[in-house]
């Protein structure tokens, strides 16, 4: 049984949800990206990208490794880039979910999410407001 799109959108706009975005919908790339929701407010859904490799020019501690063995929906072990966040208007996020621009992928388990939140709270590349999204 498939969930109604509005319910799916609300579920996948909460902390720990992972969605796949279409090419160039959030990040300018030649391929779609996995986005991890780290915070939802009344007006924003704050996300980080999930990558197959670490960025060499960013601190390793700001890119926690997430294991496929603990998150079955991942294709391989991955890295969350806590140093770059995307604050998306909540209505735009939900609209993108309903139109299929964002597609639900899965939910991070609690241990993986704890690693991400810790990395974001201490990330030296973020200001205090941005770090607070991870609390």
Specify the residue positions occupied by each region the protein language model found:
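Compact nucleic-acid interaction/catalytic patches
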Residues: 27-72
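A generic structural signal for ordered alpha-helices
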Residues: 13, 60-63, 94-95
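Short alpha-helix capping/helix-loop boundary micro-motifs
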Residues: 2-8
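Membrane-targeting and insertion segments and their boundary/processing signals
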Residues: 9, 53-59, 86, 90
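Loop/turn positions that initiate beta-strands
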Residues: 9, 14-16
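C-terminal terminal-subdomain/extension
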Residues: 69-135
């Amino acid at each position: 049984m498939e969930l109604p799109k509005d319910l799916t959108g609300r579920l996948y706009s909460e902390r720990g949800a992972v969605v796949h975005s279409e090419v160039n919908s959030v990040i300018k790339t030649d391929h779609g990206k996995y986005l991890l929701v780290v915070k939802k407010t009344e007006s924003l859904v704050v996300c980080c990208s999930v990558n197959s490799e670490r960025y060499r020019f960013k601190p390793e501690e700001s890119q926690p490794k997430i294991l496929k063995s603990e998150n079955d929906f991942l294709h391989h072990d991955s890295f969350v880039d806590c140093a770059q966040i995307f604050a998306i208007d909540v209505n735009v996020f939900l609209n993108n979910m309903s139109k299929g621009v964002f597609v639900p992928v899965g939910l991070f388990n609690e241990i993986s999410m704890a690693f991400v939140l810790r990395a974001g709270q201490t990330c030296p590349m973020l200001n205090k407001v941005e770090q607070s999204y991870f609390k």
